[in-house]
Amino acid sequence: MNKDDYIKLNKYLNNIFNYLEKNDKYLFMYLNNIYNISLHIYESFNDLYFDDNETTNNLSFIDIIYHVENIIKKIDCKYIPDLKNIINNGELNFSYNKEEEGNYFLNDNGLGIINIDREYNFQDVINLAHEFGHYLCNKGKKQTRLGYLLDEFIGRYFEIQAVEYLINNGYKENELKSSLLIEYLLDNIYEFIKNYPLIIMYYHFGAIDLESRKLFCKYFYSIDEDDFNELCQEKLELFDYIKSEYLKECSNNSFVVDESELIYEMSKIFSEDYRYILGTVLALYPLNKNDIIDLVDNLNTKKYENLTLSDILKKLDIDINSDVFIKNIDDSINNYYKSIKKVM
């Protein structure tokens, strides 16, 4: 990294920081909390063993809907008409392409489109339950900042209910791959821990240069000049790559280049893992079911539009700075893992 490289890196960081501060204000409010929780979870659970064997069972469309309907009944019967609607009005799509499209929900001209990449096992059930949670929370609504932040909490909650139902009905882990929730959580944490220091250093101390290594060592961990340079170089190359891919997509599709959209794509290396960590942790946490249903119904409505993340955590009776919170997280992850081990 030469002087010009650091100037370029800081320009990227400045754009990302300004974007996040304006559009994702809760990120910085709880950044340190999520980092400390992430460190604790990673140190406590990174050595968990997961069996990678996976089987297919040619689960039919009818089988998938049957199981998802039972899962939704377990959460709240009032959502069954919504489930039937997505089937009858063409909002549910199963992708059979060899090239994966991904599992996702999106609002499209008043419709709430759910796409599921077929795995041909009970992951199809779990994935549909997850995306259906997004559907209920978002269809026909303008997503608020709070709704964006907590969206994965709702999806993960529905996913965990699906896993619990399938395990209780005697299905084995090689059909469920329910361990993916913990594996993805640990992956998100690994990336978050890796990316967190640069944005938090820029947030507190401003421009990054080689001298910033001393502050890095003071607040994070010891690192020599070569490794610090390499860390910064990796981020610079990643931002360059994201920019290059975005410009290529715009060129190939005759899209107008939108600078704010480009910065949003770059910002996701900090915000996406944050959202998935927070969402998974809350979904695993022992919460009052009625409070969760209220969030599903109202997260993106006027009822919650003036609430902050602090208000939501208070409503859920959560103090993320407390030892009780950490203990409950440990217990929740351990209990989830034990339930998986029973069906391996």
Predicted regions and their residues:
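Active-site-flanking segments in enzyme catalytic domains
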Residues: V125, Y135-K139, E259-I263
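C-terminal, non-catalytic "cap/extension" segments appended to globular domains
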Residues: N2-D5, N14-N23, S44, K214-M344
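Active-site-proximal binding-pocket segments
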Residues: I182-M201
